[in-house]
Amino acid sequence: MLSIIHVGWLELVWFVALYPFACWTLFAVLKSVYRITLHPLAKFPGPKLAGASYCYEFWYEIVCGIQYTQKIIKLHEQYGPIVRINPDELHFNDIDFVDVVYTAGARKRDKSRHYLAGFEGSIIRFVSSDFHSFLIDTRVKKPERLKRVVLGAERHHDAKDCPMFLELLNSNLPAQEKSKQRLMYEANGATLAGSGSTAIALSNIVYNLVANPRIGHKLRSELMRKVSASKNLPTWSTLEELPYLTAVIHEGLRSMYDPSKERLPYDPSQERLPRVATEEELIYEGGSALGKSKYVIPRGYAISTSAHVVHSDESIFPNASQFDPERWLDRDGQRNKELERHLLSFSKGSRHCLGMHCRRATCLAIPASARNGTSGYQFTSGQLEYKVQERQ
């Protein structure tokens, strides 16, 4: 009798322990089947595993170490200009479609909630474009402060420093909006937005100027020829008129990554920037080496691209793995404005990089400031070894 009761309790324990797991497994399987058969994005090309689960992206991004961007490039070579890269997101690789996805004006584009999952508590997490419009309208309808600024009543402020976090702490925001965690989220967003990308771009530019003496000498000749020998740094407008310097900067921004490396340094240009069209379907008509294609992207689903994918496209940038500033110049040696529209280092549309002008100015200023400082040195590529190390 006791043995029967004992066996019954064991069966009950196993049932209670395994039943939830069995239900979850069945649900996951059915959900995966739905995603690759009846889901609105099921008709788009791409690996079935990527469409069925986020585990596919997790493997390349976490286990392999930030390698999904490189994998996406290979997926485009296999499947064409539009690829399904996870259950709820498409990725495109067509420069002519960029202005449709990353648009400005009345055509609304919201951020993907999946992309914003890592920005909990930050102002970056505000998704809706309607919310931004509301804020702008509210500020415009309050002209009192604008009047005081125009009349000079609020002009006596220190312009050398803008302590954002001190302003937040001293504001009238609710206490929960001024918590330590909230400030940490805001600091994280501000740090990731610009510091690493500028440093990586400048490191790439300086390395290639030293590793390629011909490019370095040509740039120095232009600077010595068109910029005065004064110790003062020329103005930004003067530097932007130098075609070869601008070409070097553009090439440095484009080629921040070496595809031959197994691990790539972090930079926002590697990230996908998903956009969601909330009020319209997006129609894609284009082609690739695999032939012409036409797709209708349903509204409410994310579609993205990344600067690294576009900048590695051999059809736009032949020999993309090489550092070649001449690609940005036309036959007359002037800036190639048509090619410049393919530079996506600062994204495009209504939510492009707010610090793009500061970043460009920094990238122009550093090489120009060294125009008189390298005349006593000669370098060859054999003397250099460029490595990226992660700081703990």
Swiss-Prot record:
Keyword Zinc-finger part of the UniProt annotation: no
Top-rank EC class of the record's enzyme: oxidoreductase
Cofactor: heme
InterPro entries found in the cross-reference section: Cyt_P450, Cyt_P450_CS, Cyt_P450_E_grp-I, Cyt_P450_sf, Cytochrome_P450_monoxygenase
Top-rank taxon, per record: Eukaryota
UniProt topology in membrane: Single-pass membrane protein
Listed transmembrane segments: 10-30
Ligand binding (heme): C353
Major place of residence: membrane
Subcellular localization: Membrane
Pfam name, any one: p450
Residues carrying sugar: N319, N372
GO molecular function, one term: heme binding
Cellular component annotations (GO), alphabetically ordered: membrane
Pathway note: Secondary metabolite biosynthesis
Entry keywords, A to Z: Glycoprotein, Heme, Iron, Membrane, Metal-binding, Monooxygenase, Oxidoreductase, Transmembrane, Transmembrane helix
Signal sequence interval, chain numbering: none
Enzyme nomenclature, EC number: 1.-.-.-
Keyword presence, Iron: yes
PANTHER family associated with the record: CYTOCHROME P450 (PTHR24305), CYTOCHROME P450 12A4, MITOCHONDRIAL-RELATED (PTHR24305:SF166)
Family statement: Belongs to the cytochrome P450 family.
Protein task: Cytochrome P450 monooxygenase; part of the gene cluster that mediates the biosynthesis of pyrrolopyrazines, secondary metabolites showing insecticidal activity. The role of ppzE within the pathway has still to be determined. The single multifunctional NRPS ppzA is sufficient to produce peramine via condensation of 1-pyrroline-5-carboxylate and arginine, N-methylation of the alpha-amino group of arginine and reduction of the thioester and the cyclization to form an iminium ion resulting in release from the peptide synthetase.
Protein name in UniProt: Cytochrome P450 monooxygenase ppzE
Record organism: Metarhizium rileyi (strain RCEF 4871) (Nomuraea rileyi)
Originating gene: ppzE
